[in-house]
Amino acid sequence: MELKEKFGSKLPSENSQKIFLEFVSANPTGPLHIGHARGAVFGDSLAKIARFLGHEVLCEYYVNDMGSQIRLLGLSVWLAYREHVLKESVTYPEVFYKGEYIIEIAKKARNDLEPSLFQENEEIIIEVLSGYAKDLMLLEIKDNLDSLGIHFDSYASEREIFKCKDAVFERLEKANALYEKDSKIWLKSSLYQDESDRVLIKEDKTYTYLAGDIVYHDEKFQQNYTKYINIWGADHHGYIARVKASLEFLGYDSNKLEVLLAQMVRLLKDNEPYKMSKRAGNFILIKDVIDDVGKDALRFIFLSKRLDTHLEFDVNTLKKQDSSNPIYYIHYANSRIHTMLEKSPFSKEEILQTPLKNLNAEEKYLLFSALSLPKIIEASFEEYGLQKICEYAKTLASEFHHFYNAGKILDTPKAKELLKICLMVSLSLTNAFKLLGIEIKTRISVKD
């Protein structure tokens, strides 16, 4: 069992890194949709791989729990409350949060909150509903993440961290990083390869999103990790330079920050665009897809291509029970191995203690492939290429199926030697799937 758990892993050493990994960090203004899932699954598996290789990792979710989007959430719930609870005629603004989940929150608020609240002036109502709805959404997000097998070490509140803004802005001023123009406060980010300088404080004295992010990154960098990894959506590409500029002004080494960008996901079903969720408006919810194909299939397909490339797949492929469905084909390989072990007269201990001698070319090739997992894991971590593990598992499963179909394994004089090779294949497939956050099956049936 110890061999099984540790095969391919490394113990912490002087070369081990201390990594701060921030990912998902979706605004708590709605349920998680499929666009969030890719970065979520990637970040979770990257953390598993890093820990497997002996590194220390902290996984954090940055909760954007202040600002205009949170107020807009409260306003949207208040308008839904007036329309669906008070039965008033309501005029909605051009921009607001829509979907059945907003109506659900409004109706729940009627039961959860004091009736007297709704007699207050509108700004107080919106403020209370903003916090109430945000808390509900964060609970739902955590539930969505749990259904994907993802758990964070910490959730950082933007509202709490931003209380330190004055000290951070004072340091930026001392570093000559700020100036005033057009009644706004600007960051001289163009000095550090940004396209232009950026506004931190607007004319109305409110802070921009960047200001909050600068305070957050200062809080992170004070913890002195070896490396900081952020996983953002590809639409945040232009944001990298301005954050790195702020780090330099604050006296940090911005090279310690690596930003990985997650490209878009396009889901199909029967070669048609996947149906949007009525509950969330114009989004495909993670929960809907998990209910459709399962957590493991979803994780595998999201990790099967580089994070920075577009991903398109038909969910019906993940329901097929043939070689066109990679995750089924890998499960099937492991199931075949375990079925042979059950039929074998030898114990696992006997098999593992059998010396491997006089192997032919095909047997050596399969054994070599099974033993290649450690270098695949290292390469996937160093290159942030987690798809390498998916490709490895698919290839190893295919090689095993070819080996299995080519001749007998149990009814031969070399049965123990061949079973040992098969055990090594199973071990590598199991650990590969473990790092992908997938539990490999030891038995499958047609119903699976």
Segments predicted by a language model, with ranges:
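Non-catalytic interaction-recognition regions
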Residues: 4-448
